[in-house]
Curated annotation (Swiss-Prot):
The lineage of its organism: Bacteria, Bacillati, Cyanobacteriota, Cyanophyceae, Synechococcales. It holds the Pfam family PSII_BNR. It comes from the Bacteria. The gene is ycf48. The keyword rRNA-binding does not apply. This is Photosystem II assembly lipoprotein Ycf48. GO terms for cellular component: photosystem II; plasma membrane-derived thylakoid membrane; thylakoid lumen. InterPro entries: PSII_CF48-like_dom, WD40/YVTN_repeat-like_dom_sf, Ycf48/Hcf136. GO terms for biological process: photosynthesis. It is a lipid-anchor. Keywords: Lipoprotein, Membrane, Palmitate, Photosynthesis, Photosystem II, Signal, Thylakoid. Belongs to the Ycf48 family. PANTHER family: PHOTOSYSTEM II STABILITY/ASSEMBLY FACTOR HCF136, CHLOROPLASTIC, PHOTOSYSTEM II STABILITY_ASSEMBLY FACTOR HCF136, CHLOROPLASTIC. A 7-bladed beta-propeller torus, about 55 by 55 Angstroms, with a depth of about 25 Angstroms and a central pore.
């Protein structure tokens, strides 16, 4: 009788899981035999959050707990760089961006740094309480010109090296506050609301965010651009979706669930060979070489005891080889070797 009762319970669980995953594409990902990634020793417990390069060799990495590191060998090794940051503040440096010798760093709370000589010297700008929200993303446009996005969904532009900031977005109510924000290739923005219950789009030239509903009842983790400009979405429950209709931003594919391990995905990106990478909790780093149909676990990512929070491939810097990084917690960083 106990065995019969146990079998009934097991069958019921199977049916529940089957119903829950109906309509989803689920893959049992195996571990790959090799990896294009290598682990970088940052010698820090801070979380790396962003990186950019002045040229092929010289670059800066920023992160939590006032983390600023500099490399002179293309990202193989990094050393601490001390800049003019108030000693009493535990700043979260969240964004760094260069265009030639012109560069910016944005941090929370209320910190902006600017350089015009490739990072040799930096000027600290005091934002005070001028802008709603804290700095979240900064983009170098040209000499003395930059765009700054804040945690309130406000977008500002400076044309005089940060002395004055002009509002691009007049009404931020459509953003719902943000948990994540990205700049698109054409100069627009995509944001996910602070609660993950919708996402918003700001197209170039617009002054108001356009909100869009999530694809299911599950909260949105992240939304970004595919190489062709269509969108992708990551939702709770480790679900991946792609735009089903290029002419309809609210049309989504059925969810893809590469593996079921209890951890959500935090980021999705295409590498230079157009393979798709997904990153998430507990060392989750997956790759698909067939447009998301099947997935494979990366062996290096699998061996690192961290939560991966971001994957970044940098634009062409006239580099000898593409530059890519996977950001993990507690000082973990992977570097692309190709």
């Amino acid at each position: 009788m106990k065995r019969l009762f146990s079998n009934v319970i097991n069958l019921t669980l199977v049916l529940i899981v089957g119903v829950a995953l109906s309509g989803c594409t689920v893959s049992n990902a195996s571990i790959g035999s090799s990896s294009p990634w290598s682990l970088v020793d940052l010698d820090t417990e801070a979380n790396p959050l962003d990186v950019d390069f002045v040229d092929d060799k010289n670059g800066f990495l920023v992160g939590t707990n006032r983390l600023i590191l500099e490399t002179n060998d293309g990202g193989i090794t990094w050393k601490e760089r001390n800049l003019d940051i108030p000693s009493e503040g535990n700043f979260r440096l969240i964004s760094v961006d260069f265009k030639g010798q012109e560069g910016w760093i944005a941090g929370q709370p209320g910190l902006i740094l600017h350089t015009t000589d490739g990072g040799k010297n930096w000027t600290r700008l005091d934002l005070g309480n001028k802008l709603p929200g804290d700095p979240y993303l900064i983009t170098t446009i040209d000499t003395d010109i930059a765009e700054l996005a804040t945690t309130a969904g406000a977008i500002y532009k400076t044309t005089d090296a940060g002395t004055n900031w002009e509002a691009i977005v007049v009404d931020t109510s459509g953003s719902g506050g943000i948990r994540e924000l990205r700049r698109t290739n054409n100069g627009g923005y995509i944001s996910v609301s602070s609660l993950g219950n919708f996402f918003s789009v700001l197209r170039p030239g617009e002054e108001i965010w356009s909100p869009h509903q999530r694809a299911s009842s599950k909260r949105v983790q992240s939304v970004g651009e595919q190489p062709n400009g269509d969108l992708w979405m990551l939702s709770r429950g480790a679900e991946i979706r792609f735009n089903a209709d290029p002419d309809d931003i609210d049309s989504w594919s059925k969810p893809i669930i590469p593996i079921v391990n209890g951890y959500n995905y935090q980021d999705l990106v295409w590498d230079p060979s157009k393979s798709i990478w997904a990153a998430g909790g507990n060392g989750t780093l997956l790759v698909s070489n067939d447009e998301g149909k099947t997935w494979e676990k990366d062996p290096v990512g699998e061996s690192v005891p961290t939560n991966f929070i971001r994957i970044l491939f940098l634009d062409d810097l006239n580099s000898e080889s593409p530059k890519g990084f996977v950001f993990g917690e507690r000082g973990n960083l992977l570097r692309w070797q190709g």
